[in-house]
Curated annotation (Swiss-Prot):
Belongs to the SLT11 family. It comes from the Eukaryota. CDD domains: RRM_SLT11 (cd12265). The lineage of its organism: Eukaryota, Fungi, Dikarya, Ascomycota, Saccharomycotina. Pfam families: STL11_N. Signal peptide: none annotated. This is Pre-mRNA-splicing factor SLT11. Keywords: mRNA processing, mRNA splicing, Nucleus, RNA-binding, Spliceosome. InterPro entries: Cwc2/Slt11 (IPR039171), Nucleotide-bd_a/b_plait_sf (IPR012677), RBD_domain_sf (IPR035979), Slt11_RRM (IPR034356), STL11/RBM22-like_N (IPR048995). The keyword RNA-binding applies. PANTHER family: PRE-MRNA-SPLICING FACTOR RBM22. GO terms for cellular component: Prp19 complex; U2-type catalytic step 1 spliceosome; U2-type catalytic step 2 spliceosome. The gene is SLT11. One of its GO terms (biological process) is RNA splicing.
């Protein structure tokens, strides 16, 4: 199959010698650039797979169109770029967040060229990183425990109180659906100032956004807190974009799960917390409970 048509990793394609693919021209909007793109679907009905970003964005990020992992090494692109940055190389996907679709396409082409130029220098670093990350898991129980601990460390209990977090520029965003385009959230945030980074996990249903300036973060926080949907100011603020509800609060950035299984487990926690916050928001007053404590974050979060 020609790489001129799509960019899909071997793991997503599976072990079948023959794969039947369904092609749908302009079937959806790319989650990265929001331009219409050709969707490819394959697999059976129970475990069907599909591409979720366009070929231009996939080539620019050097990632799989389905799982969004690095197409060569099978590692998360944000982790890959961090490793390259620490080694003195320019991250492959670190760029501004333009709103114009044509500009995004041009920038995607430039990112693809940049990757080719520094590919030889980065191969050694990424090979070693991939070797460590892709080792078979020895104890699945240990992974589950780590996910539970991570869920407890995520700032679900924080708010949008700018006086409580005067110098913070990072926000925790959670509760959005798996098909919600990151680009829509980025466009909304960019109204309040330059965004330094956006890290979303579609499967987990949560992520982080960081502004360059405190003034931008303050404007962003107030816009959500005062949008008429948030009577209870002591909890994460409710934001609705494109009919998709989500919660936003101040919070330090934490690493999110890398495997699909762990991401689904974290999504279970996110769903439970969203329901609990919905009941609290109806009260409209400060609820007398311990901060940052939710039933969904208990050890039996997998239920």
């Amino acid at each position: 199959m020609s790489t001129d048509i799509f960019s899909i990793c071997a793991k997503c394609l599976g072990d079948e010698s023959r794969i039947k693919m369904i092609k749908q021209v302009n079937g959806d909007e790319c989650r990265q650039c929001t331009r219409p793109y050709t969707i490819y679907r394959w697999g059976n009905r129970k475990q069907g797979n599909k591409t979720i970003i366009c070929i231009t964005c996939a080539r620019a990020r050097h990632c799989c169109q389905s799982c969004l992992l690095d197409i060569t090494y099978g590692i998360p692109t944000d982790l890959r770029d961090t490793a390259l940055e620490m080694a003195g190389l320019e991250p492959l996907t670190k760029s501004a967040n333009p709103t114009n679709r044509e500009v995004k396409a041009i920038m995607a082409d430039k990112l693809e060229t940049k990757f080719k130029e520094q590919q030889e220098r980065s191969n050694d670093i990424l090979s070693k990183l991939a070797e460590k990350l892709n080792k078979p898991e020895e104890k699945k129980t240990e992974v589950a425990i780590d996910v539970a601990k991570l869920a407890k460390k995520l700032p679900f209990g924080n708010s949008l109180d700018v006086q409580k977090y005067p110098d913070m520029t990072t926000f925790f965003v959670f509760g959005f659906s798996s098909d919600f385009p990151q680009a829509i959230f980025s466009r909304y945030a960019e109204q309040y100032g330059k965004v330094e980074s956006v890290v979303f996990s579609s499967v987990s249903g949560c992520g982080f956004i960081r502004f360059e300036k405190v003034s931008s973060a303050v404007g962003f926080a107030k816009s959500i807190a005062e949008n008429g949907l948030n009577k209870n100011k002591s909890i994460a603020g409710l934001l609705i974009l494109e009919n998709t509800p989500m919660r936003v609060c101040f919070g330090k950035q934490k690493p999110l799960p890398r495997t699909a299984a762990d991401q689904r487990k974290l999504n279970t926690v996110v769903t439970k917390v969203m329901k609990q916050l919905a009941s609290k928001s109806k009260v409209g007053v400060v609820v007398k409970t311990k901060p940052n404590v939710y039933k969904a974050l208990s050890e039996d979060y997998e239920e």
